Amino acid sequence: EDPIEMIEPALNQTQVQPQLDFGFAEGLRALMRQDPDIIMVGEIRDLATAEMAIQAALTGHLVFSTLHTNDAVGAVTRLADLGVPSYLIAATVIGVLAQRLARTLCPACKVRDDQVTRETLSEVAKPWRLSGGVRPYKPVGCLECRNTGYRGRAGLYELLLMSDAARATVHPSLDAGALRRQAVKEGMRPLRLAGAMKVAEGLTTLDEVLRNT
């Protein structure tokens, strides 16, 4: 980890120290000698770390890590950009979870939004239809939210599961669009749709969703 932000007694945690030439790749290499069942790499930043994580996965270890990308499909293209061969990506990546945080409306002062927002929301959600009642709200501002109109945050998630059909799109001439289309066909809910559902529930605003996705 870089740095260790929370001590977990049940885990064996190690902090990387680049000044001592002990980075994620070196830490992974040392960790492999301890025969772990599950490995968590704080972040994959370079090819060396990616290669070690891939090798750990190939030898039967369950590996978790993070990447800075725009969405779930972007994690696959990011690994390819780092230099990981497509056949190794297809062989080892099980799934990718993308996350965004959207501010939630203050329950003390939010008010119903107008019909225009309802119609715009339906357009944003296309080709999906929002189930249930659509109840968009807008921020106002009060003492409880310090006149911002927002209190707290809600997670927007996009889960990409690598099925056989999805893996088939991961080849040397990787087409991110083809992978995304296949994932959506198999039920992946894009970040923007996840946000639109939060708007329909009255938890956040369309502007906040569009800003974050």
Predicted stretch roles:
Residues 1-213:
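Short, flexible helix-loop junctions that flank or precede catalytic/ligand sites
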